[in-house]
Amino acid sequence: LSGINGEMRPGIVHRIDKDTTGLIIACKNDKAHNCIAAQLAEHSITRRYIALVYNNFNVDEGTVDANIDRSKADRKMMAVCPPYEGRTAVTHYKVLDRFPAHAQYKIPMTLVECKLDTGRTHQIRVHMSHIGHPLAGDDTYGIKKDMFAGKGQYLHAAVLGFTHPSTGERMEFSAPLPDYFEETLKKLKS
């Protein structure tokens, strides 16, 4: 590869946050990289994430359409900003399961699937926190004294779909939840 996207990341088309688990796309040559990057720009790549968030939703699905930019208070963080600032960011969410407050976990939790129209830095984490549902284990945008701290944030890139650069075939891949995520869900269901 000719160093597209930087010499330190040959073939990597997009990123996921440091403590997010799951799928990313890596390309083996420039042609594939350019094709996949174009699909990403056209929003034709399917990206679905599974997240465990605090508090229960009172709706089964919805959309967060709120611009994101660097936080004025802390430049290492992102934040929702007024519509005339930052960059467009759209996250669709669907409730997969709701968990009431539990003997071990004192706060109600919700398992959601998030689908991105855009792919801004920390987008799901910022949007979920913005609407009152911070991610479990997220020490940046989450709640203080998070009972899941130290295990990693509960955000998993579960599904990636795209058109193959050479064959034109639509392909979709999925990755199972990591063990710590599955174990927590079992405890919440008990």
Residue map of PLM features:
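RNA pseudouridine synthases
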Residues: 1-190
